[in-house]
């Protein structure tokens, strides 16, 4: 059968399954595709296909991630599932798979475990906006009170991490029984997807956000002026609009006098476009890679921030030795390296550590030598001599 052309008539949402190892994330993912395939809304995939996810490289870090897609009556979903716990940590920190929401899978037989907590914390820190709980393996628990206890415990746990624990839907499912085709459990998968449709908000489209383009290159065109090139990250920019040049040096205001793409002149550039912007009154030496062009007043540069960081193992091309507070690497932010200092750090659970070993996950405070347009939720890499030794996400702006 020929593959049908994918219809882009439904809003697109990115989600994923998170939760403790062996609580059934991959089985549930397979069950969702199987149940929705009966309505022609997915291609059924079995456990082995999803579990045998190929390795991907994101910013020099190897991550195993499975991608499946399916639709409900109202939406199209791209869904990520990772086989290993370390893959989740790397995935969420590097933003390899940006999630608009997640299905937290908790086995009713076990309740919340160590990684359940870690994934909820990670979701909070990297800015996953909404969760839905799938209480899995409910076919294996006869005692209704036991299930209620697990549900209460999860709600309290979610609340303790600043998620709305009382309001988040908790749906009792059995991924395995749904795959085996038991009608009652298939219905529960439908219930889960109804909850996901209702509780995970549609993401604001990049084009509706304020304009931002990171400068990749700068040219000077005789008689016309200075052109900055890059990919528009969000929003749109029109000819004649005032924009600010932010980062590294003092913020400057300029007017976009031309927008070019593939050597053609356009009236406007929008999110996703690779463009050249002609800037009025700007010399080639006034602007450099690493600065950003933004909608006037939409962003301020910062030097000090907190971040969640995954430090690469030696086998991943990371450092072979630990580092200590005061370590001065480069922070690769959007398009450029900025020297900075890791002034303080703790272990990811907030406990004090003296040094950071390759393979660790830490919370750190970083201070850059020059102000840059950093924002909460933004991804960065930590580099040393041009090679990546860590990946992070900005969890808080300090100044």
Curated annotation (Swiss-Prot):
What is the annotated localization of this protein?
Cytoplasm
tr-type G domain mapped to chain residues? 10-204
Is Zinc-finger tagged as a keyword? Answer: no
Keywords annotated in UniProt = Cytoplasm, Elongation factor, GTP-binding, Hydrolase, Magnesium, Metal-binding, Nucleotide-binding, Protein biosynthesis
Which region ranges are annotated with the description G5?
174-176
What function does the entry list?
GTP hydrolase that promotes the GTP-dependent binding of aminoacyl-tRNA to the A-site of ribosomes during protein biosynthesis.
Instruction: Cite the PANTHER family for this sequence.
Output: ELONGATION FACTOR TU, MITOCHONDRIAL, ELONGATION FACTOR TU-RELATED
The protein here is known as Elongation factor Tu
Source species of the chain = Prochlorococcus marinus (strain NATL1A)
């Amino acid at each position: 059968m020929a593959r049908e052309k994918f219809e882009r008539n439904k809003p697109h949402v990115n989600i994923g399954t998170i939760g403790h190892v062996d609580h059934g994330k991959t089985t549930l993912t397979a069950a969702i595709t199987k149940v929705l395939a009966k309505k022609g809304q997915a291609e059924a995939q079995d456990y082995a296909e999803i579990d045998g996810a190929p390795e991907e490289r994101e910013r020099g870090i190897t991550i195993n991630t499975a991608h499946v897609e399916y639709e409900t009556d109202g939406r199209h979903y791209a869904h990520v599932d990772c086989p290993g716990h370390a893959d989740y940590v790397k995935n969420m920190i590097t933003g390899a798979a940006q999630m608009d929401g997640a299905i937290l899978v908790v086995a009713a037989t076990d309740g919340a475990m160590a990684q359940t907590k870690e994934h909820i914390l990670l979701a909070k820190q990297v800015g996953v906006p909404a969760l839905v709980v799938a209480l899995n393996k409910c076919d294996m628990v006869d005692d209704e009170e036991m299930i209620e206890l697990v549900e209460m415990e999860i709600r309290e746990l979610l609340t303790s991490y600043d998620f709305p624990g009382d309001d988040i839907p908790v749906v009792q499912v059995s991924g395995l029984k749904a795959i085996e085709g038991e009608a009652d459990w298939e219905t529960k998968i439908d219930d889960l997807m109804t909850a996901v449709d209702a509780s995970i908000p549609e993401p604001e489209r990049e084009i509706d956000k304020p304009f931002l383009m990171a400068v990749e290159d700068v040219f000077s065109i005789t008689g016309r002026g200075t052109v900055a090139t890059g990919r528009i990250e969000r929003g749109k920019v029109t000819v004649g609009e005032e924009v600010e040049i932010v980062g590294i040096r003092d913020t400057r205001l300029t007017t976009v006098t031309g927008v070019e793409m593939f050597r053609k002149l356009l009236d406007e550039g929008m999110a996703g476009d690779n463009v050249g912007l002609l800037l009025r009154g700007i010399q080639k030496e006034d602007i450099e890679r690493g600065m950003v062009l933004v909608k006037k007043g939409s962003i301020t540069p910062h030097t000090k921030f907190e971040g969640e960081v995954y430090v690469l193992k030696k086998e991943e091309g990371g450092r072979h030795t630990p580092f200590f507070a005061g370590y001065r690497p480069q922070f690769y932010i959007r398009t450029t390296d900025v020297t900075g200092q890791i002034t303080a750090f703790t272990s990811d659970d907030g406990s004090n550590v003296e040094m950071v070993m390759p393979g660790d996950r830490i919370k750190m405070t970083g201070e850059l030598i020059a102000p840059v347009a950093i924002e909460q939720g933004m991804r960065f890499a930590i580099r040393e001599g041009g090679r990546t030794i860590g990946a992070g996400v900005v969890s808080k702006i300090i100044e």
